[in-house]
Each structure stands twice: as C-alpha cells, then as structure tokens.
Amino acid sequence: MNTQIIAIANQKGGVGKTTTCANLGIGLAQAGKKVLLIDGDPQGSLTISLGNPRPDKLPFTLSDAMGRILMDEPLRPGEGILHHPEGVDLMPADIQLSGMEVSLVNAMSRETILRQYLDTLKGQYSHILIDCQPSLGMLTVNALAAANRVIIPVQAEYLPAKGLEQLLQTVNKVKRQINPKLQIDGILLTMVDNRTNFAKEIAALLRDTYGSKIKVFKTEISPSVKAKEASADGKSIYAHDPKGKVAEGYKNLTQEVMKLEKPVSYTHLTLPTT
C-alpha cells in the first residue's frame, strides 16, 4: 500500500490545524480510505477533540512510541493506537511529548524518529495525517521529515498570512536537506467570513502572492461555533452538523485532496525559492 503521509502544519496557533486534521481524516475514511491520525502536539488537542478528555491517563501515547524507536526497543504492532467510532485510528499525544522534544535535541537521527515509527505502520494505512504543534521545533521538523505532503491552514487575517514565509522556509529546508519527497499540497484558508471585505481582501492577497507558486485550495472554511461544539463532543463536524457550511467545506476539501493524488497533479506544486 502506497501510504500518503500528510502533515497539517503552521507555527501559528488557532488557525484550524486540529479541526482540519480531524475532519479531513474522517472525510477520507468516509470515502473508503484507511486513515491513521497522529497527534503531534503535546497539548493533545487532536486527542481531546476525538473523545479522549484526559490524554495524560492514556497508557500509551506518541511519546512512548517515539521513545521506543529512540532506545531501539521493540514495538508491538498497533500498540497504543485508538479507534474512533467514525472510522479513523488515532495515535494520541499528551504533555510527555514536550519532554520527547527535549530528548530529540541530542539524539542521533533526531529529525527522523517519527519517520522511523511511521515506517512500522505504513502498510496498514492509505493515509496518515499528522496534526503538528504550533511551532517550528523538533517535533514539527520530524513531521515534515516523515511526510510526503503538507497542507497549511491559514486564518484569513493579516498577521497569520504574514507568518507563512517562515514556515515555507522551514519546509524548503527540510525538503532540501532531509526529505526530498516533501511537497506542499496547498494553503487552506480557514475562518473565512465572506460577509466582511477584510476577509475577502486577505484571501485575494494570499492567492495573488502565493497562487503562482503554491496551490491555494478553492475550498474555504467558514468560522463556526458548531465546529467547536463538535470538538467538545468528541465528534467530527459531519456527525455534529452534517448539513452546515463547515461540513460542506471539509467534504469539498477531501475531494480536492484526493484529486491531488493523481500523479499529474504534482507537476505544478513546486516550493518557492527562499
């Protein structure tokens, strides 16, 4: 099985990474894909949003899995992986992952520990999605080193859009030095309130600035209280508000992402020179 590994990345918090990871993952599962979600954030936001309110009480999390790889200790197949009722699997995270990030600093092959772990799972899944932490630290570098694709959620505001350059430089550096297979699938505009001229202007600015170098998804995700309610209930937006705008948006995004998996679609997705 040719596993697609997609990192959902942006060093800015609050841009919809976790919501995108959960709902894109479940959207892919609804389309018949076998999906594993990886919570790559010590805050455990993805873990919590999928119905595990106390990540610290879980017996096995991503920090344990990476620790086994780091210490060259054996892993049982599927150890610690949880199953969500909406058809996706989850490798959860808790605050111990922040300690793992510190441990990685002086480790051999420190950028590839997550990749080595995912190599043990690849044949079991068609898609692995990684919810990256909101920083450009060693955990995010590990995610980019493990992935072959990146989706960048960006809130339709000036400052988050401005911060894109730093992330693109990091992606470019990882591609150049560690992972030549890494490609940017596209920029996803989130929390776009098309009732305001400001949001429309930011969306247009992003498309003008990056559209010739990087795909900007046609799909735009609207702001929604329902999405927050869904996370609080441990459900996807499809289960919580199936006929709402956000559910429609993530269904459309899922279709766009699957279309990119045809070989011809990578020809124009080149990284900008930095």
Predicted regions and their residues:
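P-loop NTP-binding core
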Residues: 1-269
